[in-house]
Amino acid sequence: MQSKRGRPRDEGTHKAILSAAYDLLLEKGFDAVTVDKIAERAKVSKATIYKWWSNKAAVIMDSFLSTATDRLPVPDTGSSVQDIVTHATNLARFLTSREGTVIKELIGAGQLDEKLAEEYRTRFFQPRRLQAKGLLEKGIQKGELRENLDIEVSIDLIYGPIFYRLLITGDEVNDSYVRDLVMNAFKGVQATSATESM
C-alpha cells in the first residue's frame, strides 16, 4: 500500500496531493475522503494520483506520516528517563491534537482493512517503538537502567496505557499523567546508582 516506486514525480504535485489528502482528512474524516475529492482539491487528475498510490488509504497514510515524522523527533536530554518522558509526552501530545486523532480513524478503518492495519503498524507504530527501544538500550549502556531490563515489556508498560486511554476509556492523557506513568514504570528498573542519585 506504500507509494508506488520507480515512477519519476514532480515534487510540487506530490506535495499538493499529500496536503490535499491531509486537509480533507482533518476536515471530513477518513470515511468521507475519496480519491476524487483529493484530486479536485489538489487540482490534479485521478490518474496522477494512481501513478504514485494504489488507493486513498495509501495517500492518506503518506500524508499522515509526513506530519508525524516532523512532530515526533527523538529526544536527547542526557538522561534516559527524561528522554522517555519527553518521547512519550510528545507522542501523547501529538495523538491528542487534531492532527494526531487521525490515527484513531486509521485504526478504526484498519479493523476492516488488514492492508491498512499493516501499513500503520509497520510505518507508524513500529518506528515509534524502535525509537523507544533505542532510548532504553542507551539507558542500559549508560548504566542508568538495569542490565537485565526486559525492554519489550517496558515499552508496553509505558506506552500501552496511553493508547488504552485514547482508544478505550477516553480518559485524559495530559503531560502530568504521562510523566507519572513513565516514573511509575521506571520504578524498579533503574540501576541502583541511578535510583540513589534521583
From Swiss-Prot:
Chain residues forming the annotated DNA-binding region: 34-53
InterPro entries: Homeodomain-like_sf (IPR009057), HTH-type_TetR-like_transc_reg (IPR050109), HTH_TetR (IPR001647), Tet_transcr_reg_TetR-rel_C_sf (IPR036271), TetR_C (IPR011075)
Record PROSITE patterns: HTH_TETR_2
BP terms from Gene Ontology: regulation of DNA-templated transcription
One Gene Ontology term of the molecular function aspect: transcription cis-regulatory region binding
UniProt keyword annotations, A-Z: DNA-binding, Repressor, Transcription, Transcription regulation
Keyword tRNA processing among UniProt keywords: no
KW Transcription regulation (keyword) present: yes
Domain (HTH tetR-type): residue spans on this chain: 11-71
Pfam families in alphabetical order: TetR_C_11 (PF16859), TetR_N (PF00440)
Protein name: Uncharacterized HTH-type transcriptional regulator YdeS
Species assigned in the record: Bacillus subtilis (strain 168)
Gene: ydeS
